[in-house]
């Protein structure tokens, strides 16, 4: 007789969350579970995925995994802090559950302090903003996925696919992960954000002379530039 073990995953549908990622993850986990059900095994695992929307209260059935999806808005500053969401994440961590973030979702995770002293990633275009808000986090924006055991952070907006496959691999095995990736036409190979990021110079460093030079370079980038031109 086949024994079924359920892995409960909840995708947090916070205000401004990217809905295509929220429901895309649920579809991905559902597809992976269906593929796993077709495999002959003494032990069948199934992922049961759903959403979690505010207000965030104590969950009668705490999930095994909480996922903070990306956001397509600029709502990642202190004004978007949600004390109930912070409490939810801290409770999830204290009880030994897994917490994952994608893109701007890392800002919600950063507010908990759980990332302090640890390696993490977020969208490369948000790197400076994240560093300013969370100076104690060892941010590596070149990485698409940073798996630190009980916390997994993912980079760009579409990195929800990479995170989803990472979780399928962890809970259902590499064979099911590969089948799921093939079904969704996704390359499961490790990628890095640095291949996609553009150079965005920091302009908020407070050095007036350097800023003047940066502005000059921005307006003369198509011309030949010499050291005397910059002096």
Language-model regions, residue ranges each:
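N-terminal low-complexity or simple alpha-helical regulatory segments
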Residues: 1-48, 63-67
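Active-site-adjacent pocket-lining segments in enzyme domains
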Residues: 3-16, 52-229
């Amino acid at each position: 007789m086949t024994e079924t073990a359920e892995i409960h995953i909840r995708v947090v549908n916070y205000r401004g969350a990217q809905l295509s990622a929220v429901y895309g993850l649920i579809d991905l986990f559902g597809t992976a579970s269906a593929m796993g059900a077709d495999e002959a095994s003494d032990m069948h695992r199934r992922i049961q995925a759903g959403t979690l929307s505010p207000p965030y209260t104590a969950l009668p059935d705490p999930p095994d995994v909480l996922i903070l999806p990306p956001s397509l808005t600029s709502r990642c500053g202190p004004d978007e802090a949600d004390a109930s969401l912070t409490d939810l994440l801290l409770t999830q961590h204290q009880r030994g559950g897994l917490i994952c973030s994608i893109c701007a979702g890392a800002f919600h995770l950063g507010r908990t302090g759980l990332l302090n002293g640890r390696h993490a990633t977020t969208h490369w275009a948000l790197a400076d903003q994240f560093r300013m808000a969370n100076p104690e986090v060892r941010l590596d924006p070149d990485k698409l996925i940073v798996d630190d055991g009980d916390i997994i952070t993912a980079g760009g907006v579409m990195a929800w696919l990479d995170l989803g496959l990472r979780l399928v691999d962890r809970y259902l095995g590499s064979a099911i992960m590969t089948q799921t990736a093939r079904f969704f036409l996704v390359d499961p190979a490790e990628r890095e954000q640095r291949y996609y990021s553009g150079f965005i110079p920091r302009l908020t460093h407070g050095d007036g002379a350097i800023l003047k030079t940066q502005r000059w370079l921005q307006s003369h980038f198509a011309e030949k530039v010499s050291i005397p031109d910059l002096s």
